[in-house]
Amino acid sequence: MKASVLITLAVLGVMFVWASAAELEERGSDQRDSPAWLKSMERIFQSEERECRKMFGGCSVDSDCCAHLGCKPTLKYCAWDGTFGK
């Protein structure tokens, strides 16, 4: 009786280690590939031309900022210009 319980526990332990190793191997390949994937996504977003800069976005002139935002001359960021409307 004791021997069968020990054998069962040993088999379960081996199966657990085997399954964990297989899962770690799958995740490892994803983690190695993810930096390249993130870099390609970063290039895509950097290459897009944006219509305007949103609140606190960097700017050089007022026309860089979205509607109702103006470029603050001292720190060069888009902030509310005090106007309302559509």
UniProtKB/Swiss-Prot annotation:
Residues 22-50 form a propeptide. The keyword Phosphoprotein does not apply. It is found in: Secreted. GO terms for cellular component: extracellular region. The presence of a 'disulfide through disulfide knot' structurally defines this protein as a knottin. Keywords: Amidation, Disulfide bond, Ion channel impairing toxin, Knottin, Potassium channel impairing toxin, Secreted, Signal, Toxin, Voltage-gated potassium channel impairing toxin, Voltage-gated sodium channel impairing toxin. Expressed by the venom gland. Disulfide bonds join C52-C66, C59-C71, C65-C78. InterPro entries: Huwentoxin-1 (IPR011696). The keyword DNA-binding does not apply. The modification Phenylalanine amide is found at F84. Belongs to the neurotoxin 10 (Hwtx-1) family. 28 (Jztx-11) subfamily. Its main location: secreted. Residues 1-21 form the signal peptide. This toxin acts as a voltage-dependent gating-modifier. It inhibits the sodium conductance (IC(50)=124 nM) and slows the fast inactivation (EC(50)=1180 nM) of Nav1.5/SCN5A. It significantly shifts the activation to more depolarized voltages and decreases the deactivation of Nav1.5 currents upon extreme depolarization, but only slightly affects voltage-dependence of steady-state inactivation. In addition, this toxin causes an approximately five-fold decrease in the rate of recovery from inactivation and an approximately 1.9-fold reduction in the closed-state inactivation rate. One of its GO terms (molecular function) is sodium channel regulator activity. Negative results: does not show effect on Kv1.1/KCNA1, Kv1.2/KCNA2, Kv1.3/KCNA3, Kv1.4/KCNA4, Kv3.1/KCNC1 (all expressed in oocytes), voltage-gated sodium channels (Nav1) (from DRG neurons), and in a range of voltage-gated calcium channels (expressed in rat DRG neurons). In addition, does not show significant toxic symptoms when injected into mice and into cockroaches. This is Kappa-theraphotoxin-Cg1a 4.
